[in-house]
Amino acid sequence: MALYELFSHPVERSYRAGLCSKAALFLLLAAALTYIPPLLVAFRSHGFWLKRSSYEEQPTVRFQHQVLLVALLGPESDGFLAWSTFPAFNRLQGDRLRVPLVSTREEDRNQDGKTDMLHFKLELPLQSTEHVLGVQLILTFSYRLHRMATLVMQSMAFLQSSFPVPGSQLYVNGDLRLQQKQPLSCGGLDARYNISVINGTSPFAYDYDLTHIVAAYQERNVTTVLNDPNPIWLVGRAADAPFVINAIIRYPVEVISYQPGFWEMVKFAWVQYVSILLIFLWVFERIKIFVFQNQVVTTIPVTVTPRGDLCKEHLS
């Protein structure tokens, strides 16, 4: 009659020796070689500590209805026209002040509670002898991030265009993009730049100089910039028609760079360490089995009787 294996179970064998024996020293050395080298390998392979991470978020952007406009005129008009929403700036312009008609509208296209774009239109009245060759325009915004890094700041969009021929309209369709010189902190509120881009209460002309405003703004580590590589300059203005600036500024989803917190760094490092540790555990487990089974170090082998068998022997 043929015999078949119907059931099997492993027999546990232990190896005993003193704490000061070669076997104990071997186990201590094996443990050190099992757990320390994976840490060194993960650390030396770079990227062990996550110093920078990123995520996507659509910022909460609101137009602050602050405008500063400089329209550059042709040589026959000798100069420029200017206007802003800051009374102190307007008082400094004298005869060069020209008040335009401004209309704005912010739109939430996907109905998620966050505005997606700004429709901005400015009509600057001109005399028949005045011709616009260039435009410098500053619009200010309130800019907020909430998800991982909490940021509140006041930012701006700076538009500058000039052409050799007089224009009737400037059309802009671009994105208000976030620029970072360093990652944001993920802990606490970052309100370093929650200050006005333009000092609208100052009576000094220096504070309204565009070079000063732009230079001070670029000193920030976090800014916004209007990204429109191809503004459209339209020509052919009627004698009594105004010069028109028609702009659509979108608020797109941004990739935000930030410094991860302690537990996120630990989680990222732990995954790398464990993935390498599993290989070392498998290798050294095989080495220890070989060493003790072949008595490379002297020990006393003992076969451990399963608990169920001990109960049977006791009952018998």
From Swiss-Prot:
InterPro entries: TMEM231. GO terms for biological process: camera-type eye development; cilium assembly; embryonic digit morphogenesis; in utero embryonic development; neuroepithelial cell differentiation; regulation of protein localization; smoothened signaling pathway; vasculature development. It comes from the Eukaryota. The chain crosses the membrane at residues 23-43, 262-282. It is a multi-pass membrane protein. Keywords: Cell membrane, Cell projection, Ciliopathy, Cilium, Cilium biogenesis/degradation, Disease variant, Glycoprotein, Joubert syndrome, Meckel syndrome, Membrane, Transmembrane, Transmembrane helix. GO terms for cellular component: ciliary membrane; ciliary transition zone; MKS complex. It is found in: Cell projection, Cilium membrane. Glycans are attached at N194, N199, N221. Disulfide bonds: none annotated. Transmembrane component of the tectonic-like complex, a complex localized at the transition zone of primary cilia and acting as a barrier that prevents diffusion of transmembrane proteins between the cilia and plasma membranes. Required for ciliogenesis and sonic hedgehog/SHH signaling. Belongs to the TMEM231 family. It is linked to Joubert syndrome 20: A disorder presenting with cerebellar ataxia, oculomotor apraxia, hypotonia, neonatal breathing abnormalities and psychomotor delay. Neuroradiologically, it is characterized by cerebellar vermian hypoplasia/aplasia, thickened and reoriented superior cerebellar peduncles, and an abnormally large interpeduncular fossa, giving the appearance of a molar tooth on transaxial slices (molar tooth sign). Additional variable features include retinal dystrophy and renal disease. Part of the tectonic-like complex (also named B9 complex). Interacts with TMEM107. This is Transmembrane protein 231. It comes from Homo sapiens (Human).
